[in-house]
Amino acid sequence: MGRSLKKGPFIADHLLSKIEKLNDKNEKQVIKTWSRASTILPLMVGHTIAVHNGRQHVPVFISEQMVGHKLGEFAPTRTYRGHGKSDKKAGR
């Protein structure tokens, strides 16, 4: 179930203020954030945001197709290394 339109999208205040400052200066630099729950807004397009995945910051370049999604969707937290290999040689 989505968020109420009356409330508007969630975005962390510190992240929004950093992006607005960079937009005023017309600068592009990587912004580190731990706020995976923040919604991507149109004013973020063109910026690179380093989203924390629990271990490191994953750089995510924001494009127009990402607007409306959450930052955490683009920084996977789990690494799948495959299932264990079966040892068929030791059977005989």
UniProtKB/Swiss-Prot annotation:
GO terms for biological process: ribosomal small subunit assembly; translation. Keywords: Ribonucleoprotein, Ribosomal protein, RNA-binding, rRNA-binding. GO terms for cellular component: cytoplasm; small ribosomal subunit. One of its GO terms (molecular function) is structural constituent of ribosome. Pfam families: Ribosomal_S19. The keyword NAD does not apply. SUPFAM superfamilies: Ribosomal protein S19. Belongs to the universal ribosomal protein uS19 family. PANTHER family: RIBOSOMAL PROTEIN S19P FAMILY MEMBER, SMALL RIBOSOMAL SUBUNIT PROTEIN US19M. Protein S19 forms a complex with S13 that binds strongly to the 16S ribosomal RNA. This is Small ribosomal subunit protein uS19. It comes from Trichormus variabilis (strain ATCC 29413 / PCC 7937) (Anabaena variabilis). The gene is rpsS.
